Amino acid sequence: FFSAPLIVAMLSAIFLKDILSLKGLLLMVMSFGSIIYSLGPSMKVLSPELIFPLVPPLCWALYQFFTKLISGNNDPFASIFYTAITGAIVFSIYVSLNWTPIEKNSYWLLLVLLGISGFISHFMLIYAIQLSNLSFVTNFQYSQLVWSTIINFMIFGVPIDVNKIYGVIGIIVFGILFIKTEGSKKKVKIKN
């Protein structure tokens, strides 16, 4: 998913004519490089199958791109309503063919909480995309590594290695520089 902001930046520059400076694009690439460094991939695993991990970020980038393209001046509630209805119809077909009863009633509460958090996060994403340039908003997705590192350490006890520390520092530094570079009101079109 970490390549999605780069894909979105390219799509929005070509089709939406979003303004993104060369310095901003370089900072996005450097943030992406920080992610790659922190994950520490091995060069021994290069194979044609590596194209498959590009499909999810491409789908996520297309979701954000089409959300920006379609939502326009619509109410974010309308956008999330149509997204939810489409998802409910598509996945109801799948679930009806593969239904397994839920074992514990407490799982229903977790499903409801998951739905509420998904609604809130998608509503905020749609609202942010409507207010600003798409390439500006999507760069904040790089903070996922910071939060996942903290959660993995605090909740699951996964140790933090040196690569992750350097990667998190890089993401934070390049993110702050990106906000300073691309966050001026002249470049980011904020609606009043």
Give the residues covered by each predicted segment.
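Hydrophobic alpha-helical transmembrane segments of multi-pass membrane transport proteins
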Residues: 37, 54-66, 94-136, 173, ...
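Transmembrane alpha-helical segments that form core, pore/gating elements
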Residues: 42-99, 190-192
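Membrane-interface capping segments at transmembrane-helix boundaries
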Residues: 131, 179-191
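C-terminal transmembrane-helix exit sites in multi-pass transporters
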Residues: 4-26, 146-165
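Helix-helix packing/entry segments at the starts of transmembrane helices
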Residues: 1-3, 70-86, 122-154
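Loop-to-transmembrane alpha-helix initiation sites
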Residues: 49-50, 106-107, 159-168
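Small-residue-rich packing faces within the transmembrane alpha-helices of Major Facilitator Superfamily
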Residues: 32, 88-89, 146-147, 172
